[in-house]
Amino acid sequence: MNMQETPGRTQPERTAAMRARLIEATLATLLDAGYSGTTLVSIAKTAGVTRGALNHHFESKDDLVVAAVSSLLTNTSSEIRSYAKSVQDGTLSLPGFLDRLWELFSGPFFMVTLEHLTASRHNPLLKTRLVLLTRDFHRALDETWSSFFTTKELQHPGLETVLNATLCLLRGMGVQTVLRDDPAYYKRLLAFWKDVLITHTGITHKAKERQR
């Protein structure tokens, strides 16, 4: 059912639905065509709407990109937070947590991230707007890391540093996937880092014990 066929919706609801539709189309276009290949015409086509309908909600390509990145970072932050909670309650081991993060950093989330990062290098206005969004994203990640400390069994003085180092590793691996399609190579790197995490935190064993 398209938007015109959906009865009983208020104007704010229709507006929110259209914006969500355009944001989803923007993310899909960035992933498929890259930032340079993303245009208002291509986004409208992907969304199945007219250019006029698009311009009613967003004035420029970068307005759409910023809105799309904001949505992407919010959803990803929520996803990572849910994984962290699973480690806390013992339903997910720390190596399992690393596997979940790698799925994010080797998939669409990170590929889209690469597009807006490289675009920002030569687009000062876009960079200024995205810096604010990424700052909020990293603040949310810091809150997620600190949540590990709320459970006594998971407290460790170097845990926050280890987890931030983990993100740096995954970002680097994610960039490398662009030119190196070698799953076995990345699997070895992940296995090595899982040993590092176990050595520095001991969380894996404690999580298993709570599952018994």
For the regions a language model picked out, list residue spans one by one.
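Solvent-exposed, amphipathic alpha-helical segments
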Residues: 21, 25-32, 79-83, 112, ...
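Short, basic, alpha-helical segments at the C-terminal edge of helix-turn-helix-like DNA-binding modules
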Residues: 70-76
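Hydrophobic/aromatic-rich alpha-helical bundle segments in the mid-to-C-terminal region
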Residues: 125-131, 148-212
